[in-house]
Design a protein with these regions (language model features):
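Conserved mid-sequence domains
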Residues: 44, 56-59, 69-73, 77-81
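Short catalytic/ligand-binding loop motif for oxyanion handling, primarily in non-cytosolic enzymes
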Residues: 53-55, 77-78, 127-129, 173
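Short acidic/polar capping segments at secondary-structure boundaries
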Residues: 32, 49-52, 72-76, 104, ...
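Short catalytic-loop micro-motif centered on adjacent basic/acidic residues
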Residues: 44-46, 69, 95-99
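Short, conserved active-site entrance elements at the starts or edges of catalytic domains
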Residues: 74-106, 113, 128-134
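Non-catalytic C-terminal accessory region of glycerolipid acyltransferases
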Residues: 39, 62, 66, 70, ...
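A conditional alpha-helix N-cap/helix-loop micro-motif detector
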Residues: 23-27, 50, 98-102, 143-144, ...
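Membrane-anchoring hydrophobic helices of lipid-metabolizing enzymes
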Residues: 1-47, 52, 57, 64, ...
């Protein structure tokens, strides 16, 4: 049985030497991410609400990536405390930025301009704020509205858009699986069509992933 095991990781994370912590993460298809980052326009990574996203974000920052994550402002106190504790233990985590879902997108534009890897989950259960851009997709036979705002910003900024999933492994280890390039802004002439195509691929990949890893579901 696989679990998210993020809260279990929090019990030991501030006791781990940096080298040991970095070694807990395996990145599949990392050259795809490195190539995207090397273009110099930032990179968007489309995630899903499955797996220990916060843990992997911390470990990616320790590997040297300039990372920005979009989160809910009402995030739990435990996660905020862990973030603070690790900021003190690993000063290099200062390069990791936190953006809140209810803010307007100018900070996301700035992150792409500064070469950050911006990560967010698009598969929301409901759209909370009226200013958020969405795209209708079909997943598990149902029509759902998923968030498309960061993807649109990435295309406008010239930032490649990738998709990735987090898979837990034994011994507090994690695997970040970079699936594919969802959108390459160098070839985009029609933003709406590019977003529609990328979102369709994103939804298909999420459905495939959930069927393969049902134990990572956190709510029915």
């Amino acid at each position: 049985m696989h679990t998210r095991c993020d809260k279990l990781f929090y019990l030991v994370c501030d006791r781990l030497p940096r080298e040991r912590a970095v070694g807990l993460l395996t990145v599949d298809n990392e050259p795809l991410l490195r190539e995207a980052v090397a273009r110099g326009h930032g990179t968007y990574t489309a995630m899903a609400h499955h797996g220990a996203l916060h843990v992997v974000a911390l470990l990616m920052a320790l590997r040297g990536y300039k990372l920005a994550g979009v989160r809910d402002r009402q995030e739990g106190a435990l996660r905020r405390w862990v973030q603070h504790r690790l900021d003190v233990l690993y000063p290099e985590l200062g390069r990791m930025r936190v953006l809140f879902a209810d803010t307007f997108p100018r900070e996301i534009f700035r992150c792409f301009e500064d070469g950050y890897v911006v990560a967010s989950a698009m598969d929301v259960s409901r759209v909370r704020f009226g200013h958020q851009k969405t795209e209708e997709v079909t997943i598990f036979g149902e029509r759902r509205a998923f968030l498309s705002g960061p993807l649109r910003i990435a295309i406008r900024c010239g930032a490649p858009a990738l998709q990735a999933f987090v898979i837990p492994e034994p011994g507090f280890r994690y695997r970040l699986e970079l699936v594919e390039l969802l959108a390459d802004p160098r070839g985009v002439t029609d933003e709406d069509r590019a977003v529609e195509t990328a979102m369709r691929a994103y939804a298909a990949n999420v459905e495939k992933f959930v069927r393969a890893w049902p134990s990572l579901l956190t709510r029915a």
